[in-house]
Structure formats: structure tokens, C-alpha cells
């Protein structure tokens, strides 16, 4: 009689393989989600810079007053040029929130809307926002009142205000 050999894997081998795969996923998943949170924050910061640039250049090109509004409660920003019939709205992506609107106003209600007016040919007011992602990483986008150029910084890189 010939004995038929069977090939295959045992249940123990399968459990070991599944355990190894689970460990690999458990180790790499936090790094992947952290990377996604960083990408969301980076993109949100670039979008805010673009919005500020659009408002600043719109005021100069159209020679009209442009209003930049920030709603910390709604996690949104928008620019509005009433005389030029121009409006652009931006909501921050999920996982990114506005933590501060600069300059801070004492006893200000966070549910309110802050507005900054850009006058053509005039000096640019100093303003900005601070954003945070789920991991607690902060970025600040502020407009330099001398050059009128938006700057991206980490709050640790500059003094408050």
C-alpha cells in the first residue's frame, strides 16, 4: 500500500501568520494616520495662505475694500468684496481646527465672526489664525503688516501676538 501524503498548513501556522500581520499593522497604523493628519494640516495652511493672498491681491487689483472673515466656531474663512461681487469661502478639513484668531481680543466670544478689512493702497492690518490638527501640531498663518505677505510659522518660532 502506498501512503498518500497530504500537504497544507496547520491551524497553529495560520494563527502565527495572522498574529505577525496584526503586529505589523498595529505598529505602522499610527505612523500612517499621523502622516495623514500632517498632510491635512499642511494643505489647510496652504489653502489659508492662498485665501489671504487672494484677498490682498483682490483689494489692490479691483481698488475695492475686501473683507476677510474668520469663524472659529464654524471652522471656516471667507473673503468678500461687496462692490466687486466677489466671494470665496473655505472650510477647514476634518481634523484641522482654528484655535486662535490673531490679534486676540480680550473677553471675545469664540462663536463670533472676526473680520479684517483690506483697503486698496492702504497699509495691511496685522492679523492671522492659528490652526491645530488632531495630534496637537500647531501652525500659524499671519499677514505681515509691513510687507503684506502671509507667513507660515509654528507658534514656538515667534512670540505671541
Identify the role of each PLM range.
Residues 1-3, 27, 31-50, 57, ...:
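N-terminal helix-rich module
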Residues 1-32:
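N-terminal single-pass transmembrane signal-anchor helix
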